[in-house]
C-alpha cells in the first residue's frame, strides 16, 4: 500500500481521548466512512490483496468489522459471515469465550456459517487490533467450523499492545496502519 493512502487514512480517523474510559485514545473510523472516495480506495486496496487467494468468505467481527467485511466481500464476490456478541445471532451457534481486562466475554458464529462446507478459505477482518482477545476467539470459531483462516486483516494495529504479536503466532496478520 502506498504511503499517500496510509497518510490519507490516518488523517481521516478521529481520535477521541478518554473513550470508552479514562486513559484510552479511541480510534474512531466512522469519520473515514464519511469520505466515499477514500473508503473505496481502502476496499480496492484490500480487494487487490485478496483477489488471487481464492477466498470463499470474509468473516467480520462485530461491529466495525461488519462495515469493512461486507464491503470487501461484495468487492470480491464472496460470502460474508458475522461474528457477534453472545445472544445476537438467531439460529444455532458456536460460542467462544475470551478474557477482558476485568472478566470475560463471549462471541458466537452460526454453526452453519460456511454452509457446511469443510476447508473453506476465509479472511478475518476488523477495524482495530488491540489485545487480540476477540480476534483469537474468532480464530477458534473459524477453526471449529473446519475452515482455514488465510489471514487476519485490520485497518489499525496498536503496536503498544500485545495483539499483533499474539495473532502473528497463530495466523498471518496484516495491519494497514500501525499506530
Swiss-Prot record:
GO terms for biological process: adenine salvage; AMP salvage; purine ribonucleoside salvage. Its EC number is 2.4.2.7. Gene3D superfamilies: 3.40.50.2020. It is found in: Cytoplasm. Keywords: Cytoplasm, Glycosyltransferase, Purine salvage, Transferase. Disulfide bonds: none annotated. It is an enzyme of class 2 (transferase). Pathway: Purine metabolism; AMP biosynthesis via salvage pathway; AMP from adenine: step 1/1. GO terms for molecular function: adenine binding; adenine phosphoribosyltransferase activity; AMP binding. One of its GO terms (cellular component) is cytoplasm. The keyword Ligase does not apply. InterPro entries: Ade_phspho_trans (IPR005764), PRibTrfase_dom (IPR000836), PRTase-like (IPR029057), UPRTase/APRTase (IPR050054). Pfam families: Pribosyltran. Its main location: cytoplasm. It catalyses: AMP + diphosphate = 5-phospho-alpha-D-ribose 1-diphosphate + adenine. HAMAP family: Aden_phosphoribosyltr. Homodimer. Belongs to the purine/pyrimidine phosphoribosyltransferase family. Catalyzes a salvage reaction resulting in the formation of AMP, that is energically less costly than de novo synthesis. NCBIfam families: apt, PRK02304.1-3, PRK02304.1-5. This is Adenine phosphoribosyltransferase. It comes from Helicobacter pylori (strain ATCC 700392 / 26695). The gene is apt.
Amino acid at each position: 500500500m502506498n504511503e499517500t493512502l496510509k497518510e490519507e487514512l490516518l488523517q481521516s480517523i478521529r481520535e477521541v481521548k478518554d473513550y470508552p474510559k479514562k486513559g484510552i485514545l479511541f480510534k474512531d473510523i466512522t469519520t473515514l466512512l464519511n469520505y466515499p472516495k477514500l473508503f473505496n480506495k481502502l476496499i480496492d486496496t484490500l480487494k487487490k490483496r485478496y483477489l488471487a487467494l481464492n477466498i470463499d468468505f470474509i468473516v467480520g467481527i462485530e461491529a466495525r468489522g461488519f462495515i469493512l467485511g461486507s464491503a470487501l466481500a461484495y468487492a470480491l464476490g464472496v460470502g460474508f459471515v458475522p461474528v457477534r456478541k453472545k445472544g445476537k445471532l438467531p439460529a444455532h451457534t458456536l460460542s467462544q469465550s475470551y478474557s477482558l481486562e476485568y472478566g470475560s466475554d463471549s462471541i458466537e458464529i452460526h454453526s452453519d456459517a460456511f454452509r457446511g462446507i469443510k476447508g473453506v478459505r476465509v479472511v478475518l477482518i476488523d477495524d482495530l487490533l488491540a489485545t487480540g482477545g476477540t480476534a483469537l476467539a474468532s480464530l477458534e470459531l473459524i477453526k471449529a467450523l473446519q475452515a482455514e483462516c488465510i489471514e487476519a486483516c485490520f485497518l489499525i494495529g496498536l503496536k503498544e499492545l500485545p495483539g499483533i504479536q499474539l495473532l502473528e503466532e497463530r495466523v498471518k496478520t496484516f495491519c494497514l496502519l500501525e499506530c
